[in-house]
Structure formats: structure tokens, C-alpha cells
Regions:
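Hydrophobic, lipid-facing positions within transmembrane beta-strands of outer-membrane proteins
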Residues: 30-36, 86-92, 128-132, 144, ...
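Gram-negative outer-membrane beta-barrel transporters
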Residues: 38, 198-202, 220-306
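Residue-level signature of outer-membrane beta-barrel architecture
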Residues: 40-42, 86, 92-100, 126, ...
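Surface-exposed extracellular loop regions of Gram-negative outer-membrane beta-barrel proteins
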Residues: 59-70, 112-116, 122, 136, ...
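C-terminal beta-signal and adjacent terminal beta-strands/loops
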Residues: 204, 299-306, 325-338
Length: 338
């Protein structure tokens, strides 16, 4: 069978930043996408097979203007360009489920990206990404799994348009290429479920923000060589009569590799802005068929604010409470405090 989609979005955006040159941004975005996929299910004596073939096409056009920010008053125009981001991807995925409890999933995707602000200032970025996933059911409650895949992340139009030399398009910014490895275990009962996952991610040309003195408060972007991330994630759900409890914990170490900037060797330094630990707890009460209460707490651990790891930002908590009630059959009223 075939499954297709189409969407269109329009955004009109105005922002004021705390600096003069280019400090007022006007953006009108037109974004649409379409795609289709063909799925075929085949049943054999000892396995079930699913084959998926698909194609996607996305087109984003940003009419971006910048003006001088004269203490909140729009001044002279400093940038006026129509930016384009066009993506086309084709993919194939094959999945087989065996009666022994083994599941195998593998696929490949080829993607072409055309990015720029006119026909003479376009760059082409393409990538072939394979993936492989294996899982095995040990019994009715336990499942182990492994996955490998590569990923390809292009710079966004916002990242490309913020160029320190003022030309409005940073052709030196490259795509981020990553390899991801994951191994884990799941256990599920009627009222409780656990999942534990260990992962390793290596990347080249990772894109990170930075600031320069002339434009304090404005982010520019650059590639940082390579990075190495590893971590452990634990997720659990407890179901009870009146609702459920969700728990999620992440422990990670995210480091630069082979990265020298302004004469400083940042190899083995921690990537700034990423906490080493995070804990999320959600308590969801179903007060009645139409009323729900959600209590959630998020603990963000310590992280560094700079590449040299000289400034440490302390941990903090975010607590949210939300109450919602269905007022009509297809509408809901909610109120919350953060």
C-alpha cells in the first residue's frame, strides 16, 4: 500500500537583539513538503517481512532582512536576501521478524541538499546513510537490542546566514557527520516497564555557536573538528490505578576531539552547554474521564559555559504543574505553572 503526505507552513517573524548592526531581524518563511512511501508485507513460514520504499521532498524559502537597532528603533537595512533550502531524499528499509524472537531491521537513505541565497551562491550537500538494528526477545518480558547508524546534519539557514564577515552566507560551514552505536535492554510487566541504554556517538564537523566581541549577544557558528559522546540512559514507567509515573535519567560525557581554536588545543575538553546528568520525573493523575493533573520535575546537572572549561554553571531544577479539563468533545482547557 501507499502512504503519502503534503504540508505547507508560513511564518512571519520579527526579533530585536541587543546590538546595533543587524540587531533587528525580519523573516518571512514559506515551507512545504511532500512525500510518499510504498509498504509491502510478506509472510513466510518462520518469519514476517516488511519492505518500505520512500521519497521525500522539502522546500524552505526565507526572506530575511536585517536592520540597525537604534535603541529599539528600526534603522538602515544591513541585509536583504532570499535564502533557500531544498532537500530530496530516497530510502529503503527492510525489516524481518522471526518466530525465534529475532528482529532484524536494515536500511539506507540517500539525501541531496541544495542551500543558498541565489543561483550563483548555492552549495550542494549529499550523503548516503546506512542503518542496522537487531533485537531479540529472551522471554515474554525481556528484550535486548543493538543498533548502528550514520547521520548527516546540514547547517540550518539561520546558522549559514550569520557570517562574521557580514556577507550573509557562510560557505565555510560544513555538514556534521555522525556514527551512532546503541545497545540496550527492555523489561516489561503489566504495571511496570524498564529500559536501559548505553550509547556512543562520534562526529566530525560538529556545528557549535560562538560569539565575537564586536557583536556581543549574537551567535555565529563554526565547525569544531570531531567530538566523542558516550552515555547511559535509564527510563521507567510505573502504572497505577489513577495514572502513571515516568522516570528518565541520563549520565553522559561529551568531549571535543582534534579541535584547536585560537591556539588552544581543546581535545578532551567537555563540550559547553551540555549537562553531564539529567533527571526527569513526571507524575500523571487521571482525576476523572475529563480531568488530568500533571506534576513534573526536571533536574539539569552542572555544565561548562565555555570551550576551555573555565566557567562552571551550577545545576538547577524546573518544576511544572498542569491541570487540564475537556470542556467539549474535541476541545480541552488547561492551566499551568512553571
Amino acid at each position: 500500500y501507499f502512504d503519502s503526505y503534503f504540508f505547507y507552513q508560513n511564518r512571519d517573524f520579527l526579533s530585536k537583539l541587543p546590538f546595533n548592526f543587524g540587531g533587528i531581524i525580519s523573516l518571512e518563511r514559506n515551507y512545504y513538503g511532500l512525500g510518499t512511501k510504498f509498504t509491502k508485507n510478506i509472510n513466510y513460514e518462520n518469519r514476517n517481512k516488511t519492505l518500505v520504499l520512500g521519497v521525500d521532498h522539502l522546500n524552505q524559502s526565507d526572506d530575511r532582512k536585517r536592520f540597525k537597532n537604534n535603541f529599539g528603533i528600526k534603522g538602515e537595512n544591513t541585509l536583504d536576501q532570499l535564502e533557500k533550502f531544498i532537500t530530496t531524499g530516497i530510502y529503503i528499509v527492510n525489516q524481518a521478524s522471526y518466530s525465534s524472537g529475532l528482529n532484524v531491521r536494515y536500511g539506507i537513505r540517500y539525501e541531496i541538499n541544495n542551500i543558498g541565497f541565489d543561483s550563483s551562491n548555492m552549495i550542494n550537500l549529499d550523503k548516503l546513510n546506512p542503518s542496522l538494528g537487531l533485537s531479540y526477545s529472551l522471554n515474554s518480558t525481556d528484550n535486548i537490542f543493538f543498533s548502528f547508524g550514520t547521520s548527516f546534519e546540514t547547517p540550518t539557514l539561520n546558522e549559514l546566514s550569520n557570517n562574521p564577515n557580514g556577507t550573509g552566507f557562510n560557505k565555510d560551514l560544513k555538514s556534521n557527520n555522525s556514527s551512532n552505536y546503541e545497545i540496550g535492554w527492555r523489561k516489561a510487566f503489566a504495571s511496570i516497564a524498564f529500559e536501559a541504554v548505553a550509547y556512543i556517538t562520534t562526529s566530525d564537523n560538529e556545528i557549535l555557536p560562538y560569539e565575537i566581541e564586536e557583536f556581543a549577544g549574537k551567535n555565529f557558528y563554526r565547525n569544531v573538528g570531531s567530538t566523542f559522546r558516550r552515555g547511559f540512559e535509564l527510563n521507567s514507567q510505573l502504572f497505577f490505578k489513577a495514572g502513571r509515573l515516568n522516570l528518565s535519567y541520563t549520565l553522559s560525557k561529551n568531549q571535543f576531539k582534534n579541535f584547536v581554536i585560537d591556539g588552544d588545543d581543546l581535545s578532551d575538553k567537555l563540550i559547553p552547554g551540555i549537562p553531564s546528568q539529567m533527571l526527569e520525573i513526571d507524575l500523571i493523575f487521571k482525576l476523572s474521564r475529563k480531568r488530568t493533573l500533571i506534576l513534573s520535575n526536571r533536574l539539569i546537572g552542572e555544565r561548562y559555559a565555555d570551550n576551555l572549561n573555565e566557567t562552571l554553571i551550577g545545576s538547577y531544577n524546573i518544576f511544572n504543574i498542569k491541570y487540564s479539563k475537556e470542556v467539549l468533545r474535541n476541545s480541552e482547557f488547561s492551566i499551568g505553572a512553571n
